[in-house]
Amino acid sequence: MIFQSFLLGNLVSLCMKIINSVVVVGLYYGFLTTFSIGPSYLFLLRALVMEEGTEKKVSATTGFITGQLMMFISIYYAPLHLALGRPHTITVLALPYLLFHFFWNNHKHFFDYGSTTRNSMRNLSIQCVFLNNLIFQLFNHFILPSSMLARLVNIYLFRCNSKILFVTSGFVGWLIGHILFMKWLGLVLVWIRQNHSIRSNKYIRSNKYLVLELRNSMARIFSILLFITCVYYLGRIPSPILTKKLKEASKTEERVESEEERDVEIETASEMKGTKQEQEGSTEEDPYPSPSLFSEERWDPDKIDETEEIRVNGKDKIKDKFHSHLTETGYNNINTSNSPIYDYEDSYLNNNNTGNTEIFKLQLLDKKNENKDLFWFQQPLVSLLFDYNRWNRPFRYIKNNRFEQAIRTEMSQYFFNTCKSDGKQRISFTYPPSLSTFWKMIKRRIPLLSLQKTLPNELDNQWISTNKEKSNNLNKEFLNRLEVLDKESFSLDILETRTRLCNDDTKKEYVPKMYDPLLNGPYRGTIKKKFSPSIINNTSLENLKERVRINRIHTIFLPNTDYQELEQKVDTVAKKPLSTEIDEFLTLINEFGNEPKSSLNLKDLSLFSDQEQGRVNSEKRTKFVKFVFNAIAPNGTTSEKKSIGIKEISKKIPRWSHKLITELEQQSGDYQEGVPLDHQIRSRKAKRVVIFTANNQNNDPDTKDTDTADQDQTKEVALIRYSQQPDFRRGIIKGSMRAQRRKTVIWKLFQANVHSPLFLDRITPPFLFSFDISGLIKPIFRNWSGKEGEFKILESREEQTKREEKKEKDKKGENKRKEKARIEIAEAWDTIPFAQIIRGYMLITQSILRKYIVLPSLIIAKNLGRMLVLQLPEWSEDLQEWNREMHIKCTYNGVQLSETEFPKNWLKDGIQIKILFPFCLKPWHISKLYSSRGELMKKKKQKDDFCFLTVWGMEAELPFGSPRKRPSFFEPIFKELEKKIGKFKKKYFITLKVFKGKIKLFRRISKETKKWLIKSSLFIKKMKKELSKVNPIVLFRLKEIDESNETKKEKDSLMSNQIINESFSQIESGNWPNSSLIESKMKDLTDRTSTIKNQIERITKEKKKVTPEIDISPNKTNNIKKFESPKKIFQILKRRNTRLIWKFHYFLKLFIQRLYIDLFLSIINIPRINTQLFLESTNKLIDKYISNNEINQEKINNQKKIHFISTIKKSLYNISKKNSHIFFDLSYLSQAYVFYKLSQPQVINLSKLRSVLQYNRTSFFLKTKIKDYFRTLGIFHSELKHKKLQSYRINQWKNWLRRHYQYDLSQIRWSRLMPQKWRNRVNQGCMAQNRNLNKWNSYEKDQLIHYKKENDSELYSLANQKDNFQKCYRYDLLAYKSINYEKKNDSFISRLPFQVNKNLEISSNSNTSKHNLFDMLGNLHINNYLRKGNILYIERNLDRKYFDWKIIHFSLRQKEDIEAWVKIDTNSNPNTKIGINNYQIIDKIDKKGFFYLTIHQNPENNQKNSKKAFFDWMGMNEKILNRPILNLEFWFFPEFVPLYNVYKIKPWIIPSKLLLLNLNTNENVSQNKNINKNQKQNFFLRSNKKIKNRIQEAKEPASQGEKERGSDIENKGNLGPVLSKHQNALKKDYAESDTKKGKKKKQYKSNTEAELDLFLKRYLLFQLRWNDALNQRMIENIKVYCLLLRLINPSKIAISSIQRREMSLDIMLIQKNLTLTELMKKGILIIEPIRLSVKNNGQFIMYQTIGISLVHKSKHQTNQRYPEQRYVDKKNFDEFILQPQTQRINTDKNHFDLLVPENILWSRRRRELRIRSLFNSLNWNGIDRNSVFCNENNVKNWSQFLDERKPLYKEKNELIKLKFFLWPNYRLEDLACMNRYWFDTNNGSRFSILRIHMYPQLKIN
């Protein structure tokens, strides 16, 4: 057995070794490459298919294999790879070759094609076949399925150690695959040739010569296929001649580009080197696998040459390299033998000869412009033909405001090299290429022996020791901090703060976060900082001058320098010789640009400001450059001696040298300076429609010509109209190839829209594939339930609404179809060339024809006609109407201009002609007597008061609409005639009728008498016969019986028929879905019954006529018994039976019908009725169950409101048992209740709920029905697990709630939420007076002990750190809870840190009282755990006193109200009573700051006296009402804008109390003054550097600002001066700031406009929100206004358009200063503040979900009632104390529960501590890296931080497993650290999958 298992084990391991061996993998990957089929196979197939002898086949195969072998070798051998993989060589060689080959195939006599001689080697065609196959194999193109397969070998080569072995085995694998393929192909061909069925095919036999033809034309077929592939690839190759060359951004930038190339030269060259496989690797990233004939490399082509040279031929080539590069950029005029260029390398290495290079650079620059045009032909051919800067690939042009040009994305970001990492030599894939090149150069210079080689162990040990030292230091520091904590000497200094880069020591200003390297790491941009001249004061100017001058010169010399480099190079240029010229230099700059650039603005690379740069022509520039150089030239000797300085090695980001603009930007003129005037990016087809031009004369003599041109432009009001056709351009750049674009596949012959194949499934499938199953099933069910009687009543209403909806839908659909048709027509006119011109002229001719020819002639004809018919002519009326008709020229969109004015470019853009009051010819005009009826008609036709003229002279409702019907001229005439004829006919017909009737009667009488005579004669004959046979008495008796029975039967049948008809008519009356079917059935039935009736009637009539004299009543039938005999009875029965049998069929049918109706339907309806009743009853039960006596009014209210998470209904009755026990199982009660409540309102706002309710834990529901109901509503998903219900504690639940700040809306969002009446009703409920409220003053003082008397330093640092800490803590807790949620009852963290206010509450007694099966909840208020500010918006609980904010109405219009509103600082009168509700105002509001007013829980709230609100769910007695941030009246103080801005930028630094400082204008002015003295700086100043638009106040010194503030405060609430001051500031501000670059500054006419602009620009998001109808009306109004503005006398049209309701005055209220409040009240304008996390600040990412970033220190007070729970003693983190149930909790010591001890450290240091201590370096040698996660022995213990001796838990001594989320504390860098590479990725996409618990479990003994 052992032996067997041993053998088996060996076998397995052997197999694994074989499978993993290089050879096997190589074979596998090689085999896979066979499947990448390219055009090279075409030649091979050709040789096989065309029977040209074996020699050709052999040569083809060998050529094919040789080509592939070369490709494989090229992977490993670099020179060959460079030769084959170079784009230009292949393109240049391939195209001519392909074309040559194609033509050669078509000319048979070119060589002796086809005929083989004996000496076959001399025959050229065989060599050609070989060459074809060889060369085609080298072209790296493919057809099926993807080039990826061909590249697999290259990719896998990275992982292999023995590369040659892998390459050879790969080739062998390919060979095997190829041989198999060839064999299979041969078999197929043989089978085709030999297959009898193919040969005996009828079609082939009938066309005998078809096969021969095919065989003969095989060569042609192949050449056609080849040509197609060639053309296909030609489309994808950047052809050197045809593509459009983009203009460089500007001449300076060209210069820069060349400089940059020179600077980056070495680096990019070496970048190409990498490892040999690197080029192939880069193709992986290529969005198009192999887009051209060869694998087009994605970098600078010339640099590939250089790499080659460096790699292969070493040092000698370098000098040529530099030279060749210079020639390329146009420096080839220098005589190389004499120039110092050969010293360049030496100077680079040895720092000598720098001066020469320096001067040499200058010379080059100077001469470059002259020589550029002269020597262009001397540039290398490659770079002339294939400019790598050309935008050949259809990349998107992604603009970047921070950088000058767009970054080139196609550069590989990987460069592989070995480096020291973790004490070992490892391969790094982001190694700086310049370093490796530099190292190689050093190696060549210095002999290898002198370079010390460090042993690997040395490295390792050194690294380990330094690491140990660092980790020890960290641990020490950490422990020290913890010890300080233990000693109870708590101060915030224990918490480590983040180091920030300081900008200005005096003002304590930090660098903005975006630019702070200590926060964000090295940032890829440089700061663009612009100082306006007024801000820079004298001292700073002095400091700047020297630096700026030198830097400016530097920007000319070394264009692409960085700020850091500059610091090192300040001394390189001699300062003295420059000083004389420099002032002229600066003045010159100032002439060109208004603003001097700051020292940081080096990347601008221009000597001129943004506005002017485009305008300064090249002559000025060259003069200027010469001036600068001449100024320096005499002193050149001094600069020679200086060293060039050490260059910092950094990777230059490759950029495009173009700045491109879109078509749209070109039209609107929004582009910046230095950009070509012509657009390069093709925008969507659009037309600029000018709707209004104001021709204001420019009277200002000072303005220059350029300005006037600008002004004229701005006077045009234009709309941009996009054509409705699909956008095939999609921002493509001119000259790039459309064929290569991704995601724009066109697969149809005519395709309306561009589709990405990704969304194929979304496209509506063709008709064949769509099966409407439900549509098929419905009618079947309808038929089945077709005969229901009662059900119809239930469904009728629903059906009716459905039908109505369907009608509406159809109508909408019809409108949409019409709209679509109109658009299509419009687009057709737009797209066809010259169509607009033709259409325009046609319209104008039609207009003239209509107005002046057709209509007048019609009027004349009509009136002449009237005269002929002897009626009065109506000349005046007709002419009046004709005059009223107006033809107005409109733009193509239908914007009205005027009668005379044509739209701009109307021939090109198109025109519409709108006819107002179109003339309609009427046969007569209605007199005034009939006007009342006419008015109604008019009202109906008011809409038809205008129309658009079509090309054929018809009238259309809308442009390009279908022509409408005109009321016919003859129709009323005909109607009148018809009426008269009708009257005449009536009289005539009446007489005719009477006459006819009489004739009929006469004829009938004659007929009847005739019949009667015949019948009576026959009857008499019969009677005679009968009488002779039978006794006469019997005869009469029998007749009697017979007659009576028959009549009875007839009556019966009549009755039943009637009933049936009635019942069916009832059924018919209902709204049946399948009525047509039922109708048809019923018709059949009624037809049958009626026929029976008729028959019966006819029989009876006949009988009556025959025997009129015998009239025997049926009553006498009883006498028959006397005369009965069996024989007679039998006869009667027989007769009856025959009749019954005859009618049985109908009876049976009727019976079944009745049975169905009575029985079957009732059976069907029983369950329906039952379920309905059941549901209703359950609803009622639940209603009763949950709220026994609810106010009905509340229900009504609930339906009106949009509800928040739970609308907890208030109940106003007392419960006898007051002392409730709060400790109970929440899962049973609260959520069920919440869900029930959610089902109540008509409108459910689910968007916020879903996230809360969807969690896969215990199901909330006692009844599955409720659950199903919510599932259908879509509130949660169905996978709720039915686990064991968990027990929650109230405080845990509250703590959970407290952390979900989504639901805790900031107070600004709420203003007057509900109608006042309703609020009053709630507030007027009985309110128990609370005695304890008087203790508030003392309490406030206690609470504010830690607020540390408001002085600046404390205020900022304390608030900042504390809030930050709380934020962190909350993240931790969230993380902890979400991981350890199973052990809720054991969780030992349940409180927030920093319980500043000692706001204690008494634990409730544990006497429990049950009510209605539900545990009662204590009266705990949510205000203690919601943000304090939000108390304003909670509906008041009835037994508390609050300050009711809603009483004070706040309106912008009444400034006095603002004053009163602010005056609520009640130091003067602490017990002010406001309003009827006697709310007591809380004092010291100013201390807290207006935004965070706290309302405290009652300290000694006696629960026995407080009224229990029934079902106070989780203590949430106050209802929270959800509203969006709509009524933001605060922000409409101009006062608040800068403040808000400051707060936005530094939310941690400025406590919000500062925001209202200026508005606290109350009696205690002195106190406020004191506060202000403490805060010496004007906070406007503080915000200045952050706010882009500088507020004018900042320009004044701080002292002046303070004086102003003092005076403001003394105004005692009169905010006028404050506001006006600010408005002045705004005015100044807007006069200074330029709103658009390169444009004239914008002047504001009014303050409102300026304010509006300020709001809408930066601080607020605004939306114009209206419904479609309003939108439509708005547009209509605008169109009318456009017309009215042009008319000289607009009143007439205005009035008529108002009458026609074209123009609605309510919408377009023209006011001089439109008040925003009005718009907001109407709900049209919605303004919301931009959230604090708007832009690029990673720290605020979580803000959207949890608003911790806004938390102020006064906001959180923890609810400290923890019944029956043990409490953490702060002294010892791990000790629990059992509290007596009624004892007050001791929270006097201000400690906090540390969830994670390391939170003391800052995040970066925390990370370091973790990584150093947890990933123990010593254990890495023998262990797999990931074992850290599972091997607990490796994990350092945390017992040093947590006291081991004491048990952590109450009864259990469990392990605490502290797991950490990846997100909250430690960002993604940790993950990158794990792998010991800092990933160089542009975005975090690679990380998105890693949702892991990163840190190992923390083990505590």
From Swiss-Prot:
It comes from the Eukaryota. One of its GO terms (cellular component) is chloroplast inner membrane. It is found in: Plastid, Chloroplast inner membrane. Keywords: Chloroplast, Membrane, Plastid, Plastid inner membrane, Protein transport, Transmembrane, Transmembrane helix, Transport. Disulfide bonds: none annotated. The chain crosses the membrane at residues 18-38, 64-84, 87-107, 124-144, 172-192, 221-241. The keyword Plastid applies. Residues 1591-1611 have a biased composition (Basic and acidic residues). Residues 248-299, 797-817, 1591-1618 are annotated as: Disordered. One of its GO terms (biological process) is protein transport. Its main location: plastid. It is a multi-pass membrane protein. InterPro entries: TIC214. Residues 256-268 have a biased composition (Acidic residues). It holds the Pfam family Ycf1. The keyword Chloroplast applies. Part of the Tic complex. Involved in protein precursor import into chloroplasts. May be part of an intermediate translocation complex acting as a protein-conducting channel at the inner envelope. Belongs to the TIC214 family. This is Protein TIC 214. It comes from Nicotiana sylvestris.
